[in-house]
Swiss-Prot record:
This is Ribosome biogenesis protein BOP1 homolog. Required for maturation of ribosomal RNAs and formation of the large ribosomal subunit. It is found in: Nucleus, Nucleolus; Nucleus, Nucleoplasm. Residues 90-111, 136-150, 193-202 have a biased composition (Acidic residues).
Length: 833
């Protein structure tokens, strides 16, 4: 079926001669001058059928059959004048067929004539009549459909018609032009011209909005619009084919269409659009600042936005706000004369408005005149609470233990300066004896203490004040959980110590026993019962000596535990240091007559010899602390009850004792030796003194700010000191930095019992009566310009509280990231990583 397209043009066509094979002009009769209606322009070929039949076919098909246009066939345009059927014969038909053959060869020549109509020389005379009829036509658009190559048309002229044939080609410029009076038919496909585009044209796969994974196991990806399978092409390529595709010069602009399983090459416009989006620019051709003018013609109901403005927000609020009511009140008061305004103004106000000032006045004089004294109200006294009542609740009254703790507490740290008491009636209440003193202190505060106002600063992000610390997970290994419990003691375990090789653990308890445990198996291999509670135990830090020192009551005993068999199996160094007779010690003994050395011998000491007890050292007072020198030949003891001579240094190989300090304001509590230098640390209740043993002089004093020191320890490198106190403080000192603490850590809720450094790893820990063991990462750098790094790692809390006592002692394993702890619950616990 031939599909044709009818257009209307009001342009006068140019006439040109078409050469055919016979080189004969086409015979065309002169058209009649009287034309009742304009002729139509259509693309068709006139057949030999009668005119009446042609008219019937045209009218019937125009009203019933919809026109289907073929986008692939080019449209033709024919101009019809008055057709003369008398001059039409069979010879002309043969000539016409020969001309059709020539038209195929000359098609390119016809199209290159800018869409103009080609006529022969004999048609020049009728050109004027035809063009005139075309210009007068108002409805020149006729769309029809013919079933064969020859179409039939009937003109609506009352006069006789004349037959003529004219073959034309419509160019691209003519296709773009659309008649203003074009009439559309009921054909649903009439709008889909070759120039139209839609989003569905590129969509070949018509499976709909379903997951494409459903087609992974098939050889096709879906179906087209006709229901045919779309076989996989691009997705079936292997790596070699994909590599060869990179040779394509347009590979960099080729994208893969997953739905249609094909590759799409992006055009220059697409690349420009993507580049604009990437650079956050507007798309090409878009003007964001184009001028806008609305004439009002676009609104069919003649409603202009100026007359149909949106409702303002103020209409949703109640009539009259507080500010409006206040303004109305003041306005009425001024109008009625109730409020009188000072129209004259203050003196100097005019100069201020003009910007003038006294050039020769003293500097600051103007400010003093205008600056007033800002009065700050006196702070109000705190209102009395339930604890100050004459009949307070039972929970506010102190029991015996709380009363003792209240008396031992510093007055500045007490929650209140009186002891709550309970009376049955108000008449039994005595006179408050501190009333005059409190009133006097109140008066002193009012006229002597400066007053200030605190401005609360709002901080959006309080975390910015915190230091940037590494994550604990990046600082492993460190002890993180409880692994083993050593059970055997019946009372609180006051002290524990680990051997230099990390194989044996010694412990001393209030049940008057000394036990040695094997760390790997938790078996108790040695047990010794003494006369009183064990205060301290300490292994010799030198691994060549198998010596354990134990302090209980006023005695120090030196033990060589029979862990390796009989005494003869001990190392010769151990036997040598214990059996060497004292030499040149007469002067030292004269200086320390209060300290006596005894060799354990005889039948009465047979049980002690079997247990490995070799030497006994008797002191005048109870020994609380014992520490070894790193070489293992010296150790020091501390007896706080002795006063000025509380610190003593013992020489094991010479069996000698000396008191280096003769005067002391406060009793000494703890002593420590430097790990690799002849430096001695002595701590009293609130100050740590550092002495040089070679020069016998004081090097420096460390100001702790602590009220009662309980424990100190020295870093393995010797340049840092850590201290713990009964006032819940832990202080880190950098000896190269200052005599004051580098860091003060207040994280324990009760008294700190022990602080220690790890011998080999950058770890330190502290234990307290609050049942917690805090493990920290403490890195000390060789660079003196870089401060130590302190990072909290883990809080271990597994002990139980007995009589308000918690963890009493802790010690690190010499090689592993393990920590041992002993508590008032008579248990020893091992924490591992």
């Amino acid at each position: 079926m031939n599909k044709s397209k009818v257009t209307s043009k009001k342009v006068v066509a140019e006439t040109k001669v078409v050469n055919n094979k016979k080189s004969e002009p086409i015979a065309v009769s002169e058209p009649k001058k009287s034309v009742s209606k304009p002729t139509t322009t259509a693309t068709t070929t006139v057949s030999k059928s009668p005119v009446s039949t042609i008219t019937t076919q045209i009218l019937g098909k125009r009203t019933k059959t919809p026109v289907v246009r073929d986008e692939e066939n080019e449209d033709e345009k024919l101009d019809f004048g008055n057709i003369d059927l008398n001059n039409y014969n069979s010879e002309d038909d043969e000539d016409y067929e020969s001309e059709e053959d020539d038209e195929g060869d000359d098609e390119e020549d016809v199209e290159s004539q800018n869409g103009s109509i080609v006529y022969s020389e004999s048609e020049e005379e009728e050109e004027g009549g035809i063009n005139k009829a075309l210009l007068e036509a108002e409805e020149s658009l006729v769309e029809y459909q013919s079933e064969d190559d020859s179409g039939s048309i009937s003109s609506k002229s009352s006069s006789s018609t004349t037959t003529t044939t004219t073959t034309t080609k419509k160019t691209n410029n003519d296709e773009e032009e659309v008649a203003p009076n074009k009439q559309w038919t009921n054909d649903p496909n009439q709008f889909y011209d070759s120039d139209d585009s839609s989003e569905d044209e590129s969509l070949v796969n018509r499976i709909g909005n379903i997951p494409l994974e459903w087609y992974d196991d098939y050889d096709h990806i879906g179906y087209d619009v006709d229901g045919n399978k779309i076989m996989k092409t691009e997705s079936m390529k292997d790596s070699i084919d994909k590599y060869l595709d990179q040779q394509d010069p347009n590979f960099w602009r080729t994208v893969y269409d997953k739905v249609n399983d094909k590759k799409v090459v992006l055009s220059d416009d697409d690349m420009a659009l993507l580049k604009s989006i990437q650079n956050k620019h507007f798309i090409p051709g878009y003007d964001p600042y184009a001028d806008w003018y609305d004439s009002g013609n676009n609104h069919p109901d003649s409603i202009h936005p100026m007359h149909n403005a949106p409702v303002p927000k103020r209409s949703f609020f109640p009539n009259g706000t507080d500010e409006e009511r206040e303004i109305r009140r003041l306005t009425k008061a001024i109008r009625m004369g109730w409020i009188k305004l000072n129209k004259k103004g203050k003196k100097g106000e005019k100069d201020k408005k003009d910007g003038n000032f006294d050039l020769w006045a003293d500097e600051g004089e103007e400010k003093e005149k205008t600056k007033g004294i800002r009065r700050i109200a006196a702070p109000k006294q705190k209102l009395p609470g339930n604890v100050e009542s004459f009949n307070p609740p039972e929970e506010y009254l102190l029991n015996e233990n709380e009363l003792k703790a209240w008396h031992l507490m510093d007055p500045r740290e007490r929650p209140h300066n009186f002891i709550p008491q309970k009376y049955q009636s108000l008449r039994q209440l005595p006179i408050y004896n501190k009333l005059i003193k409190e009133r006097f202190e109140r008066c002193l505060d009012l006229y002597l203490c400066p007053r200030t106002t605190r401005v609360k600063q709002f901080t959006k992000d309080p975390t910015k004040f915190l230091p940037t610390l590494p994550k604990p997970q990046d600082l492993r290994p460190f002890p993180s959980h409880e692994e083993i419990q050593f059970l055997g003691h019946k009372a609180r375990v006051r002290s524990i110590s680990i051997s230099p090789n990390g194989q044996w653990l010694a412990s001393g308890s209030d049940d008057c026993t000394i036990k040695i445990w094997e760390v790997s198996s938790t078996r108790c291999l040695y047990s010794l019962e003494v006369e009183s509670e064990v205060q301290t135990v300490a292994w010799n830090p030198n691994p060549i000596y198998n010596i354990l020192a134990v302090g209980y009551s006023n005695k120090i005993i030196i033990i060589t535990p029979p862990l390796f068999g009989t005494q003869t199996e001990h190392s010769p160094e151990t036997e040598k240091i214990l059996t060497k007779p004292p030499t040149d010690s007469s002067t030292e003994q004269q200086q320390n007559k209060s300290v006596n050395w005894y060799q354990v011998t005889g039948a009465d000491k047979a049980k002690l010899l079997e247990k490995g007890v070799r030497i006994e050292i008797h002191h005048p007072f109870t020994v609380k602390n014992l520490t070894w020198h790193y070489k293992g030949d010296y150790f020091s003891t501390t007896s706080p009850e002795e006063g000025t001579r509380s610190v003593k240094i013992h020489h094991l190989s010479k069996r000698a004792t000396q008191s280096p300090f003769r005067k002391s304001k406060t009793p000494n509590q703890v002593t420590r030796f430097h790990p690799n230098k002849p430096i001695f640390f002595v701590a009293d209740q609130n100050i740590i003194r550092v002495y040089d043993l070679m020069k016998q002089e004081l090097i420096k004093k460390l100001i702790t700010g602590c009220r009662y020191i309980s424990s100190i320890d020295i870093h393995p490198q010797g340049d840092n000191v850590i201290m713990g106190g009964y006032d819940k403080k832990v202080c880190w000192f950098d000896l190269d930095l200052s005599v004051r603490p580098y860091k003060v850590l207040n994280y324990h809720k009760m008294a700190v019992r022990k602080v220690i450094y790890h011998p080999t790893l950058p770890l330190f820990a502290s234990c307290s009566d609050d049942l917690s063991i805090h493990v920290f990462h403490g890195m000390v750098y060789d660079d003196l310009l870089q401060n130590a790094l302190i990072v909290p790692l883990k809080i271990l809390k597994t002990h139980e509280s007995i009589n308000d006592l918690g963890v009493l002692d802790i010690v690190f394993h010499p090689k592993q990231p393990w920590i041992f702890s002993s508590g008032a619950d008579s248990t020893i616990r091992l924490y591992t990583n």
